[in-house]
């Protein structure tokens, strides 16, 4: 099991998940995203059909927004 999945099982409560079902399956550890796609620790790719408003509009990891965020973080981190 991927380290992220182990940490998730140990420390994260998923309030809208049936715990009995969740405990039987190995969690998916998402490690990167680009555009509308996500990738897990095993290299499997998924279409993100559950994205937030931000990623619905811009996708995951858009270069222009990443640059703007880096510039802003140099001025004020939060």
Task: State where each predicted segment sits.
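Active-site-adjacent loop/helix segments that line or gate small-molecule/cofactor pockets in enzymes
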Residues: 1-32
């Amino acid at each position: 099991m991927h380290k992220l999945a182990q940490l998730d099982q140990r420390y994260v409560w998923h309030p809208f998940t049936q715990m009995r079902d969740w405990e039987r399956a190995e969690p998916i550890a998402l490690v990167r995203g680009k555009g509308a796609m996500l990738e897990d620790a095993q290299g499997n790719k998924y279409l993100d059909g559950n994205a937030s408003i931000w990623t619905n509009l811009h996708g995951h990891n858009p270069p222009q927004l990443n640059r703007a965020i880096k510039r802003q973080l140099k001025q004020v981190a939060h």
